[in-house]
Amino acid sequence: MAESQTGGGGGGSHESGGDQSPRSLNVREQDRFLPIANISRIMKRGLPLNGKIAKDAKETMQECVSEFISFVTSEASDKCQREKRKTINGDDLLWAMATLGFEDYIDPLKVYLMRYREMEGDTKGSGKGGESSAKRDGQPSQVSQFSQVPQQGSFSQGPYGNSQGSNMMVQMPGTE
């Protein structure tokens, strides 16, 4: 994983075959990838307690996840540039995922984004803050630590990654 990328992947526009922008030329590996400890922790959630993950599997997943994030973010960034905006928001990412063919993930992510904004007090999606309607009405928001989201695609739920449940639990940010 220490070798540098010199071809089709680098986090740029997926149509250009790579990112040739000045900011991508001197990117360190630690800045390009999510921390391996985080990747490993997420991967272990789908294994039995005595399950092991090979180092190369963790590194491969680390690279794939980082490339996926760059792919979706690049599409959202292109949209924002066309609209002459500088900030990518959650709605832009959902649009990018739909555009790139990841429709099965849109509905659960919309629910997650809505509940996240409720917790953050942002109902407009602008990222500028503000109060949710429940707070304005003097009522506390009824967002639980875990939100049930309808299952989409082939996402597995069970502790061993093989159950066929119809819902998945999503931990909301800030409730750990």
UniProtKB/Swiss-Prot annotation:
Keyword terms: Acetylation, Activator, DNA-binding, Nucleus, Transcription, Transcription regulation
Pfam families in the record: CBFD_NFYB_HMF (PF00808)
Low complexity bias spans: 139-159
Stretch list, region Subunit association domain (SAD): 61-72
Region of interest called Disordered, as start-end residue ranges on this chain: 1-29, 121-176
SUPFAM superfamilies: Histone-fold (SSF47113)
Subcellular location: Nucleus
Gene Ontology biological-process annotations: glucosinolate metabolic process
Segments of the chain annotated as binding DNA: 34-40
Assembly mode: Heterotrimeric transcription factor composed of three components, NF-YA, NF-YB and NF-YC. NF-YB and NF-YC must interact and dimerize for NF-YA association and DNA binding.
Function comment: Component of the NF-Y/HAP transcription factor complex. The NF-Y complex stimulates the transcription of various genes by recognizing and binding to a CCAAT motif in promoters.
Record protein name field: Nuclear transcription factor Y subunit B-10
Species this chain originates from: Arabidopsis thaliana (Mouse-ear cress)
Designated gene of the protein: NFYB10
